Amino acid sequence: MIATPLKHSRIYLPPEASSQRRNLPMDAIFFDSIPSGTLTPVKDLVKYQNSSLKLNDHKKNQFLKMTTFNNKNIFQSTMLTEATTSNSSLDISAIKPNKDGLKNKANYESPGKIFLRMKEKVLRDKQEQPSRNSSLLEPQKSGNNETFTPNRVEKKKLQHTYLCEEKENNKSFQSDDSSLRASVQGVPLESSNNDIFLPVKQKIQCQQEKKAPLHNLTYELPTLNQEQENFLAVEARNKTLTRAQLAKQIFHSKESIVATTKSKKDTFVLESVDSADEQFQNTNAETLSTNCIPIKNGSLLMVSDSERTTEGTSQQKVKEGNGKTVPGETGLPGSMKDTCKIVLATPRLHITIPRRSKRNISKLSPPRIFQTVTNGLKKNQVVQLQEWMIKSINNNTAICVEGKLIDVTNIYWHSNVIIERIEHNKLRTISGNVYILKGMIDQISMKEAGYPNYLIRKFMFGFPENWKEHIDNFLEQLRAGEKNREKTKQKQKTGRSVRDIRKSMKNDARENQTDTAQRATTTYDFDCDNLELKSNKHSESPGATELNMCHSNCQNKPTLRFPDDQVNNTIQNGGGDDLSNQELIGKKEYKMSSKKLKIGERTNERIIKSQKQETTEELDVSIDILTSREQFFSDEERKYMAINQKKAYILVTPLKSRKVIEQRCMRYNLSAGTIKAVTDFVIPECQKKSPISKSMGTLENTFEGHKSKNKEDCDERDLLTVNRKIKISNLEKEQMLTSDFKKNTRLLPKLKKIENQVAMSFYKHQSSPDLSSEESETEKEIKRKAEVKKTKAGNTKEAVVHLRKSTRNTSNIPVILEPETEESENEFYIKQKKARPSVKETLQKSGVRKEFPITEAVGSDKTNRHPLECLPGLIQDKEWNEKELQKLHCAFASLPKHKPGFWSEVAAAVGSRSPEECQRKYMENPRGKGSQKHVTKKKPANSKGQNGKRGDADQKQTIKITAKVGTLKRKQQMREFLEQLPKDDHDDFFSTTPLQHQRILLPSFQDSEDDDDILPNMDKNPTTPSSVIFPLVKTPQCQHVSPGMLGSINRNDCDKYVFRMQKYHKSNGGIVWGNIKKKLVETDFSTPTPRRKTPFNTDLGENSGIGKLFTNAVESLDEEEKDYYFSNSDSA
């Protein structure tokens, strides 16, 4: 807002349109008529009056129209809008009024004359209202909201600019120049309608105090209606009664709203509320303070300073003539009594302020109320809180309680440090105050603050007796968590510096390839001729690592892309005799993609479990890990390595098809040009494969380096990709090899339970100078390929590839790699049982001198698989075992089937299968256990057939039934013959019917924590409940049926027993099974008789009534369908 402090009492500024501005007095000078950068003392302002009176009519929109809600009263303000503001901002700091000249010239009128003049002005404005309406312009549509001043009592227009400069003892108007410079300099000459001139009642009453010479004026605003309070920014819903004074100051506050709030004790607090974040702004240069003026019954109108609480604010004691002491807060330096301030800022007004949390109201509460509560505390020393909660203070070393005050509504109060528990709801603080906790703890606020549930339960109804122990444990956890976060931040900062160090070390390794193995960041680079290591600079993809193999006589140039979440060490080995003269340069890159990092230092193995499967980051590690956990090679060991690293067998799986390459490039967000270049580079070279690599269907590509100096081409130089970290044991520690190998092999079963985990175990052995022939090596390798092809029936995530067993001169490297594509998943599996003896035989045949236990890392190909198949421990395309089937059927029987996520819950209960697999398996075999036996029987037969043992199968197929009819041997031959028939040709009619698919098993009940559950543990043990709940039912008593007969059957014993029984009862005549004694079924529901009264009858004679059960069934059978073995026509 632009306001000029007028120094003459008869001058007033009506905010009229341009047609009425011609009636302005001589001393009214507008700022826009003063050139910028001009020093304009007050006495020289008169010469600018002509320019100010010659304003054009297009300047009408400089004045804003302020309307009421019903548009009946129109208020105007002398505020310039932002649209017509001059581009040159006015330097008000140059205005230095002549204090001496103005001191004696000020001639002020009495308050009575001022009121009479204002009343006349209101009546005159009411008569001229139609003419003004035609000349008013619409307000500018800016981002600021308009402040509506409702007044529906009388239809009168009030003037917004009131100048009531009252001076006691004819004191001059003084302004602090320094404060004006701090607040006004550099601010553009613009304003908006959110400088609040609080509405004044149209029937202005002159409330003169008892002592008239004091000229104390109080202008009383109308009490607003409940519906008209929504323009206030200070909790209009709390029935805020707004009152203001047309007093000696004009209140301005940048980005603030001046409003008044009434408390219960008729104390009016004028708050300065920030419109942006509902907090006070500590800007003294833009917030003006006033003296408090008595209103009505002596209650005080206190204007709050720009601080949040009343603590620390400076107050004055101004003695008024009526003898009352009125406290006033001063926000500007120096004496600011009875002053009017010029502010050229553009405050921003947001009428609807986003509401904060309930707990933040305590920061915005009126200072006067806090002062009243504080005074009450000093007297009573007892505070009652409701909706209370616990908060940690003093860097998690103590606690306090916070809650709503019962005496004052909607005011939150927090205590000092709690030191003593008087009762469960009565506490004493360090300052001596007593806090009484009413009701239960505020659980919602406690959970939002991050407190654990067990602590909330302990303090649910108050403080327990051992509250100190619980609080100390909780605060200790908080402090430990902060320390861990600080350490993590430091490691992250250190990791950023490692990236720069790695780049510089890479360049140094190119130039100086001597003695760099003992650095923290090294590169394994055995250069020979034109063999180079090219690392992509990751301009398009920062996380993907590309290694291009370049040779002088290149035929194979596959582009390798390491899997995600895999920590790589790259070794490039050159050929020939130059290896002995070169130094080992190591570069180790680590990547920690998640919190789950488990390091086993004793076994020299590390397991990285990744939560984010598809994160592509640069492989970084902090310096402390590099330096502390890395064992550098000694000079003797490096020389020994350089001699013995002549033979290394590399396993590389390049991407064959163009589509797969494009998908892999798209995963790492490479550009289209890069994808095309990579595809064109890889596809032609893959077509030029060597004959050895073409013969390998499962390994797809193999490089064998340094077989001999003249026999092998340079394209067999290897690029060996290993995981994690290479450690060389001392030459004398040969006995540690066996133990470490056993530890490695023990971890192999765990691979089946961890999805996307790729384990590489790398053993380096001593090689002798004599070389094996190329033919023998090729033959062994072809045998290894044949073994891999035979075992591709086992489909799993892990691809365990064991390279061929080498003689003493070769370096055997058992490698476990992850397949690059889904097609190769079926080709890269060897059973674990075969993996162990192959490695053991290798260790026995070759003299092992060096050991390279490498870590297990987590790799992921999430995009190529179903998103629901990423559960940990998921085993894909593997046959179901008995345990999984049992879990499947128990889960299917217990879980409710009408809910949408039924199969997902079943898969979660099984734990190792996807929902699709569970559904497919249950639909294939809903009864479960029957077909599983056939599957387990087929497995060894298939494995025997795959291993070439066809002789036994041929013998079984040529079995002839030669035994006589009715003999035990005949029965066994028939059973063997039937078992060898192809079972795949027979379809199970009942498993394929639609009714069978729609069969729904009765679900059992979920686990319940209640002890009074009617059906306890139904899902765990789905058996018939006890007869305590259900009525007694008499079941048929068959004396010959025992629990042992209901179990599994041994065929050999059963056949012998049945045959002997058959032979023994043959002479008696009749059906053998009909001679078994049976007790008649009773129909009454009497209490079952004890067992001691019904002893077991060993006589299985004619008295048995079991034949009556099967009479109808036996008679209905045809003669052709009678059981051949149990009929009377059996021959001896």
Swiss-Prot record:
Interacts with SP1. Interacts with MIS18A. Identified in a complex containing MIS18A, OIP5/MIS18B, MIS18BP1, RBBP7 and RBBP4. Interacts with KAT7/HBO1. Interacts (via N-terminus) with FLNA (via N-terminus). It is found in: Nucleus; Chromosome, Centromere. InterPro entries: Homeodomain-like_sf, KNL2-like, SANT/Myb, SANT_dom, SANTA. Residues 130-150 have a biased composition (Polar residues). This is Mis18-binding protein 1. The gene is MIS18BP1. Keywords: Cell cycle, Cell division, Centromere, Chromosome, DNA-binding, Isopeptide bond, Mitosis, Nucleus, Phosphoprotein, Ubl conjugation. One of its GO terms (biological process) is cell division. SUPFAM superfamilies: Homeodomain-like. The modification Phosphoserine is found at residues 9, 110, 131, 135, 172, 192, 299, 365, 772-773, 824, 860, 1008, 1086, 1104, 1116. Residues 123-154, 306-332, 482-518, 765-798, 923-957 are annotated as: Disordered. Residues 497-513, 779-790 have a biased composition (Basic and acidic residues). GO terms for cellular component: chromosome, centromeric region; nucleoplasm. Residues 383-469 form the SANTA domain. Residues 930-941 have a biased composition (Basic residues). The lineage of its organism: Eukaryota, Metazoa, Chordata, Craniata, Vertebrata. The modification Phosphothreonine is found at T653, T821, T1087, T1089. The keyword Phosphoprotein applies. It holds the Pfam family SANTA. Residues 875-930 form the SANT domain. Its main location: nucleus. Disulfide bonds: none annotated. One of its GO terms (molecular function) is DNA binding. Required for recruitment of CENPA to centromeres and normal chromosome segregation during mitosis. There is a cross-link at residues 7, 65, 211, 262, 534, 612, 639, 647, 727, 742, 840, 899, 956, 964, 983, 1079 (Glycyl lysine isopeptide (Lys-Gly) (interchain with G-Cter in SUMO2)).
